[in-house]
C-alpha cells in the first residue's frame, strides 16, 4: 500500500528511479499513479458502464493520449491477451477470466514502471494465465517494468526472478531464479513451500 501511495509511510523512504515517492505532494499523487503504476487486483474493478475496450483504454484517455494511439495500443494488448473479440461487450456480458484479462490489459496498456499484481491469475484458466504471465515477463525483460506480485500459486511464482516467502508477516526465505530453468525454479519453490508447511 505504501508503494502504491495509498498509505503513507511512518518512517523511511521509497524511491522510484531516484524519485522519493514518500515526498510527492498530495495534489500530484494521482498523476504519479497514472503515469507510473499499473494495478491488477483479485476483484477486477471494471466499470460496468464502459465496454471492455473503454475499460482498457481508460488510463490512456485520462492521460490524454491521442485517439489513434489509444485504439492501436488497446487492440494490440487485447490481441496479446486473447480478448479482441469481446472489446465491444460490457463486463456483465463476459466470463470471470475475460474480466481478469481486461483488468490485466488495463494495468499494462500504458507500460507502467511498476505493476502491482494481487493474485493476477486467480480466475484465469491455465492457457490465459500463461499468456498473462508471459506478457508480464516480457514487460519486465524488454520494458524494464518492475512487477511486484502476490501469489499463492507456485507456477505463477516460477515466472518471477526473485521470490520472498512470508510467514507470520516476516520474510521467511528468499530465492532467486538466476540461470535456472523454470521447471527447476518451480521445484525449488515447492521445496520452500514444504518447509513453510504448505
Describe the predicted segments one by one.
Residues 170-194:
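Conserved beta-strand-loop-alpha-helix hinge in the C-terminal portion
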Residues 109-113:
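A short, proline-enriched helix->beta-strand linker immediately N-terminal to the Walker B motif
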Residues 12-20:
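Conserved ABC transporter NBD signature motif
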Residues 90-94, 98-100:
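Conserved ABC ATPase signature
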Amino acid at each position: 500500500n505504501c508503494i502504491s501511495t495509498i498509505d503513507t509511510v511512518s518512517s523511511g523512504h521509497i524511491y522510484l528511479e531516484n524519485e522519493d515517492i514518500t515526498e510527492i505532494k498530495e495534489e500530484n499523487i494521482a498523476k504519479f499513479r497514472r503515469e507510473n503504476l499499473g494495478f491488477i487486483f483479485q476483484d477486477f474493478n471494471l466499470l460496468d458502464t464502459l465496454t471492455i475496450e473503454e475499460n482498457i483504454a481508460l488510463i490512456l484517455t485520462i492521460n490524454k493520449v491521442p485517439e489513434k494511439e489509444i485504439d492501436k495500443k488497446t487492440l494490440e494488448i487485447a490481441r496479446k491477451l486473447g480478448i479482441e473479440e469481446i472489446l465491444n461487450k460490457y463486463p456483465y456480458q463476459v466470463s470471470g477470466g475475460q474480466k481478469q484479462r481486461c483488468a490485466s490489459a488495463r494495468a499494462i496498456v500504458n507500460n507502467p514502471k511498476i505493476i502491482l499484481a494481487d493474485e493476477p491469475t486467480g480466475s484465469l484458466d491455465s492457457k490465459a494465465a500463461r499468456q498473462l504471465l508471459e506478457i508480464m515477463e516480457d514487460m519486465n525483460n524488454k520494458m524494464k517494468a518492475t512487477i511486484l506480485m502476490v501469489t499463492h500459486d507456485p507456477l505463477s511464482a516460477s515466472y518471477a526472478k526473485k521470490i520472498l516467502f512470508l510467514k507470520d508477516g516476516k520474510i521467511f526465505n528468499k530465492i532467486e531464479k538466476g540461470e535456472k530453468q523454470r521447471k527447476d525454479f518451480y521445484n525449488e519453490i515447492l521445496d520452500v513451500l514444504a518447509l513453510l508447511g504448505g
